[in-house]
Amino acid sequence: MKRLALLGALAAVLPPAPSNAQTVGGVELIELTIAEAHEAMLAGTLSARQLAEAYLDRIEAYDKRGPAFNAIIMTNTRALARADSLDDALRATGGLTGPLHGIPFIVKDNYDTHDMPTTGGSASLEGSMPADDAFQVRRIREAGAIVLAKSNLAEFAFTAMETVGSRIPGWTFNPYQLNRVTAGSSGGTAAAVAANLGLVGLGTDTGNSIRGPSSHNALVGIRSTQGLTSRDGIMPLFAHRDIGGPMTRTVEDAVRIFDVIAGTDPADPVTAEADARRPPSYMEFLVDDLEGVRIGVAGQLAFTETADPEILMRFAAALDDLRGLGATVVDDFAIPDLDSLRRGLGCSRFRYDIENYLATLPDPPVSTLEEIEEGGQVHVTVMPRVRSYLEFEGTPDTHEGCVRARANEERLRAGVRGAMAERDVVALVYPTWNNPPRLVGDLESPHGNNSPILSPPTGFPAITVPMGFVWDETLPAGLQIYGDAWSEPTLIRIAFAYEQATRHRRPPETAPPLK
C-alpha cells in the first residue's frame, strides 16, 4: 500500500498544467480531434509520423514514469513504419487514404492484432499471436488508422470495478486522481485516451467496460446494439453480451470511428442485419438541438439510497440542460417490476467461449481454461473466478442457466419497450455511475454502477458522455443515454447536443504538455 500512499500524495501536490501548449506540426496535441489532425495533414503542416511520435513520447514520459498511469501493455514497433507509409500515400495522391488516416489508436489487449500479441491482460497468454486482426481492427486499419499501442485491462475482462491483471504488475490509475480507479475492464484505454497518450481508442463492453471506464475518465463511449458491430477476433468474456466500440474525448470522434466499425461481418452471424439497419453515415445525426425529442428519466437507476449527492446534483443539471436544448424530459418514468425483471439473467459461459477462442490461435500457449488454472499465471484476485467458471458444463444452448437467462432477457426487453412506448419516450437517461471513482483497493464502498442493468441484458445500445466533475471538481461523472435496438442515431443526436451545450470534458492535470 506504500505505492497508493505515494500516489495519493502525488495527486495532491501535482502542479496544474502549464499554460504552454504541446504543439506538433502546427496543431495543439492536447485534446486534438480527428478533424483537426486531418486538416493539418492536408495542409502539409502535420505528418502521421510526427503525430505518432508525439504520442509515443507522451507514453514514454507518463505511462511508466512520472504519474505512471500503467495503462499500456506494449507499444507497436511497426507504428512509425505504418505512419511513414501513410505519409507517402498522402504525398503521392494529395488525399487521405481513409476516414481514419494517420490516427493513432490505443487498442485494448483483448482485440486480435496480427502484428502484436493479444493476451487479455493475462500472463497465461503472454506472447500469444493471433492469426489475423479482429474485424474492428482490420476495419480501422483499412480506414488508415495506426495501432499505436495495446492497453491494459482487467484480466480476461472479468471486473468492472478496477483494472488489474497479471500481464503487467499493478493497477492502472485514474489520471484525474492517481489514487482512484479507472474502473474496468477497459481501464487502460480509458486512462491513455483521457491523458492524451493516444488520439482515440477501442474498448470492449460485456456489462460495463466501455461505458464505465469512459465515465470515470471523462470520455465518450459507445456500446452498440448487439449485432451492429462484429465480435470477431475479440477475446470473449460472455460472447452473447460482448461488444467492442470507441472510447474518445468527443462524441464526433466516437461517431467517426463508429461509422468505420459498424456493419455486417460474415464471420459473426449476429451482424447479419447490420448493413441493412445502419444509415450511410452516423455523422448526419451530429445536430445541436433536441426539439421534439422525448427522454425518460430512469429514476429507478439514479435515485438509490447510496447515490452520491453531488452526482445527483450533476444529473439534475444535465436534465435541465436537456430541457434547454428543446427536449421533453419525462421525470416520472418507470419500468414496472424492474427488480423482478432483473433476476435470472446470468449465463457464465466464459469456459465455453474462451476455449473456442483459444482454438482459433495458430500456436496457443494454453488450450483450455483448466490449463490456465493449473498454470497459475493469473492475478490472485482473478483465480477465484477462473475456478468458478470451470464449473460450466455443456454449451450455452443446453446449459440450464443460459436457457433460463435467454427467456428472462426477452421479458426484460418487453418490459423496457412497453414502458417506453407507454410514455412515448425514445431514450432513457441516468448517471453512468451513481458514485465517483473509488480509491484503488477499495472494493467495499458504494459504486453505483448502472451500466449492466439495461443495455447488456436487452442488447440495446447506450452511450456515455461527460456530465461534469464532483468532489471539488476533481472526479469525473458521466451521463448515460439508452434506447431501443438500432436507435444509435437518436442516442448520438442526444449525446452530441448535450456535449456541445455543456463542454464538460477537460484533460487531467497529471499529464501536462511536454516541452
Per-segment meaning from a language model:
Residues 101-120, 284-300, 348-417, 466-476:
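Short helix-loop capping/hinge segments that flank enzyme active sites or metal/cofactor-binding pockets
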Residues 30, 111, 117, 243, ...:
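Gly/Ser-rich, acidic/histidine-flanked active-site/gating loops
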Residues 44, 102, 142, 198, ...:
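Glycine-rich, small-residue loops and helix-cap segments
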